Amino acid sequence: MGQKRKDLSHAELMMMTIADIIKQLIEAHEQGKDVNLNKLKTKTSAKYGLSAQPRLVDIIAAVPPQHRKALVPKLKAKPIRTASGIAVVAVMCKPHRCPHINFTGNICVYCPGGPDSDFEYSTQSYTGYEPTSMRAIRARYDPYLQTRHRVEQLKQLGHSVDKVEFIVMGGTFMALPEDYRDYFIRNLHDALSGHTSNNVAEAVKYSERSLTKCVGITIETRPDYCLKRHLSDMLSYGCTRLEIGVQSVYEDVARDTNRGHTVKAVCESFHLAKDAGFKVVAHMMPDLPNMGLERDTDQFVEFFENPAFRPDGMKLYPTLVIRGTGLYELWKTGRYKSYPPSTLVDLVARILALVPPWTRVYRVQRDIPMPLVSSGVEHGNLRELALARMKDLGTQCRDVRTREVGIQEIHHKVRPYQIELIRRDYVANGGWETFLSYEDPEQDILVGLLRLRKCSEESFRPELKGGVSIVRELHVYGSVVPVSSRDPSKFQHQGFGMLLMEEAERIAKEEHGSWKIAVISGVGTRNYYRKIGYELEGPYMVKRLQ
């Protein structure tokens, strides 16, 4: 056999290896054994004398159809990617100058990227070396190609790409000219539905009926590009979540880092956005110039307890010093110094302990490759280190993401046992917020959540005037289940969403005294609400409460 093996080409050996791996996987599955895939790949590759291991994509592609259902979920690369039930596709708009250069004369001191920087082909606030930027540059910033490529890539890795959420990155999208924005959003919807549209409204109409559903679009923006006209535009795009760059709650820090807007603007934009039904995710930067540990901790206490802020989600980006920025000059001349790594882990651990149970921490650091960073975060796994530090301190992180059923299952192999409805009320941004969730309180696992808001009097959308409650988010966690099928072991489509909606309608009618309830719904999920008696009014799905 050894002689024969030498005559075979590399490709043939590779095929034999893959076939052998799949055979062993099927046997293990039939015997109900757990397999260490990496060990299996190494062993089998060595057996056939290969220097390189077969790629996961090739193994997944070669699984015979009758075994796909059993094997592909086990082979899935990076299960966290769809653990929350949705495949996230990040796309970037073309590089453009930062909008506030016109009136502050310069960009923020810590900001890399943009058309004038060392990294000239990158968008504002990105270096062009992050995975998303590289994909965007490869597609020449074409939204259609970025979407198609990423969806295909996730499919090859064994994920179910049935529900897609877009994140529009690359500086302030809303500062771009209107015709470019329309072209961009139109192409995102068209890439999923396969239709070629002439305008956004048409694209949205076809996207509603697409097989791959767009369940939401997230747009990154600044508080000064989050005014009424911007919010109305974003509603027409099918956008459901905003990421607003706050960075700091201190007026002097916002001024000295050259943000070009005040903290008051932040509070106002939060208020307007929540009254239009958006979910608000704030970007926060600890470790900015003239802060210090005390002020940094205090600002997060303020951020979560002051009703003028209280976001629905947060991305935590510890400050990085990157060449070509104003901060780099301060750092080189010794006028700015980053926290030592252990202090930073301490700070992040403290911040995570402050996060209320209705807030989701999406990220704990930027996706910037280490060689570009002159000073700042030294570890790639800051969240893990912070969670380990919290264990030592005896505190725990109770944000939405840590308690999600899908993520708990991947990390701790824990499944919920006794699920009950839990309700939390709080006041934020001039409105009454109710956070409803189905949880297993014993093990602290979250299965589904709903955010309900009694709109304040100042709501500017005509659909939401005069005693209307709005559901800003409905999400049942757990692995993606295609929209039409039911899998009894997974938590989507088990009716939790329906139960949450019924409770929300009851609260809106009996406690808020509202005559109508509205839902800000992703374009692809509108049919779900149609089934339970809602109809489209403007960008919202609404229902009269008798």
UniProtKB/Swiss-Prot annotation:
| Cellular component aspect of the GO annotation | cytoplasm; elongator holoenzyme complex; nucleus
* Record InterPro entries: Acyl_CoA_acyltransferase, ELP3, ELP3-like, ELP3-like_N, Elp3/MiaA/NifB-like_rSAM, GNAT_dom, Radical_SAM_C, rSAM
Family matches, as PROSITE patterns:
GNAT (PS51186), RADICAL_SAM (PS51918)
Q: Which Pfam families match?
A: ELP3_N, Radical_SAM, Radical_SAM_C
Q: In which pathway does it act?
A: tRNA modification; 5-methoxycarbonylmethyl-2-thiouridine-tRNA biosynthesis
One Gene Ontology BP term is: tRNA wobble base 5-methoxycarbonylmethyl-2-thiouridinylation
Localization annotation: Cytoplasm; Nucleus
Question: Which residue intervals define the domain Radical SAM core in the entry?
Answer: 81-371
The keyword Transferase is assigned to this record: yes
Query: What note does UniProt attach to the cofactor annotation?
Result: Binds 1 [4Fe-4S] cluster. The cluster is coordinated with 3 cysteines and an exchangeable S-adenosyl-L-methionine.
Locate the N-acetyltransferase domain: which residues?
395-546
Amino-acid positions noted as binding [4Fe-4S] cluster in the UniProt annotation, renumbered to this chain: C98, C108, C111
Where is acetyl-CoA annotated to bind? K163, E473, L474, H475, V476, F496, G497, M498, Y529
Q: Where does it primarily localize?
A: cytoplasm
Entry annotated with the keyword Ribosomal protein = no
Keywords recorded for this protein, A-Z: 4Fe-4S, Acyltransferase, Cytoplasm, Iron, Iron-sulfur, Metal-binding, Nucleus, RNA-binding, S-adenosyl-L-methionine, Transferase, tRNA processing, tRNA-binding
Q: Which domain of life is it from?
A: Eukaryota
> Which cofactors are reported in the record for this sequence?
[4Fe-4S] cluster
Please report which protein family the annotation says this sequence is part of.
Belongs to the ELP3 family.
Q: Report the function annotation for this chain.
A: Catalytic tRNA acetyltransferase subunit of the elongator complex which is required for multiple tRNA modifications, including mcm5U (5-methoxycarbonylmethyl uridine), mcm5s2U (5-methoxycarbonylmethyl-2-thiouridine), and ncm5U (5-carbamoylmethyl uridine). In the elongator complex, acts as a tRNA uridine(34) acetyltransferase by mediating formation of carboxymethyluridine in the wobble base at position 34 in tRNAs.
Q: How does it assemble?
A: Component of the elongator complex.
* Protein name, as recorded: Elongator complex protein 3
Species whose genome carries this gene: Gallus gallus
Classification from the root reads:
Eukaryota, Metazoa, Chordata, Craniata, Vertebrata
Name of the coding gene: ELP3
